């Protein structure tokens, strides 16, 4: 679905769970996994990602939940496709491959629009 906005991608991904988990348990796992990530923020339970909050940045907002009726994991993610686009991804990957700090050349807060 195309939304009437000039930039940004809001994506929802679902996956079938192989064991029964609560939203709180999955949220804790994601929060722990991404705790040291420079660019990924796992939002508090119930707070949805907003593309406008990421305009011009290399950051990602993520929300996780469990749909207990269907036993599916639901992950919602927002990025600014012009901030965290192919060029920024290439810089981030090159930094990692060359042993540089992952954030080198990518530390910008965005446009604040």
Roles of regions detected by a PLM:
Residues 1-75:
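C-terminal substrate-binding/catalytic lobe of Rossmann-fold NAD(P)-dependent oxidoreductases
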Residues 61, 66-113:
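NAD(P)-dependent Rossmann-like dehydrogenase/reductase catalytic/cofactor-binding core
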């Amino acid at each position: 679905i195309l939304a009437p906005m000039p930039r940004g991608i809001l994506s929802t991904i679902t996956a079938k769970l192989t064991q029964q988990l609560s939203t709180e348990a999955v949220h804790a796992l994601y929060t722990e996994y991404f705790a040291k990530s420079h660019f990924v923020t796992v939002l508090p339970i119930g707070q949805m990602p907003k593309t406008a909050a990421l305009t011009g940045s290399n950051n990602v907002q993520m929300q996780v939940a469990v749909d207990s009726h269907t036993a599916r994991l639901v992950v919602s993610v927002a990025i600014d496709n012009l901030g965290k686009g192919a060029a920024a991804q290439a810089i981030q990957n090159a930094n990692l491959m060359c042993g540089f700090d992952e954030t080198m050349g990518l530390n910008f807060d965005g446009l604040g629009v």
